[in-house]
């Protein structure tokens, strides 16, 4: 059931889908080039443009808390149809995985777009496996449906501020 918002209340805000929503001002001083907040507990991502327009997306999140970072970062690179190589720790856990998968390959776990964060190996990306959205299923990244990462990709420039919570 959605919480009732009161000016001085301490009620968690929830939208009709039961995602907890955030006010960007609670986390950042200014919109800058835009803001992304990825909430691993509610498995959602909020994106604000420089104009303040906000959109909300369901996500996949890491399998365990140990597999991801929390805190502030930013988008430092964007790629269409990115290639994928497992990290050294992924290769250690899954030696049968390929060393590299070309962009556009239907087995590529990064989907059709990827936002590269300032943290090594961390991405916000699409997925070819739509069953992963709304689940703990990643090795550290935040995943979106391909059509939704394409939307975020088009709206979020390099320099977009990001917070993972």
Where do the model's predicted regions map?
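Short, mixed charged/polar active-site loops
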Residues: 53-56, 70
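Exported/periplasmic cell-wall-interacting domains
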Residues: 31, 66-71, 79, 83-165
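N-terminal post-signal-peptidase region of extra-cytosolic proteins
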Residues: 17-35, 39-40, 55-62, 95-104, ...
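N-terminal twin-arginine translocation
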Residues: 1-14
């Amino acid at each position: 059931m959605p919480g009732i918002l009161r000016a001085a209340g301490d009620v968690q805000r929830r939208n009709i889908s039961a995602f907890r929503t955030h006010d960007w001002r609670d986390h950042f001083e200014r919109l800058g080039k835009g803001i992304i907040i990825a909430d691993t507990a509610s498995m959602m991502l909020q994106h604000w443009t420089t104009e303040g327009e906000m959109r909300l997306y369901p996500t996949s999140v890491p399998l365990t808390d140990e597999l991801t970072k929390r805190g502030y970062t930013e988008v430092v690179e964007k790629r269409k149809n990115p290639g994928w190589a497992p990290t050294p720790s992924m290769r250690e856990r899954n030696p049968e995985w390929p060393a590299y998968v070309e962009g556009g390959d239907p087995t590529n776990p990064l989907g059709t777009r990827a936002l590269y964060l300032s943290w090594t190996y961390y991405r916000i990306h699409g997925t070819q496996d739509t069953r992963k959205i709304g689940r703990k299923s990643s090795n550290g990244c935040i995943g979106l449906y391909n059509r939704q990462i394409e939307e975020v990709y088009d709206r979020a420039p390099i320099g977009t501020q990001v917070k993972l919570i």
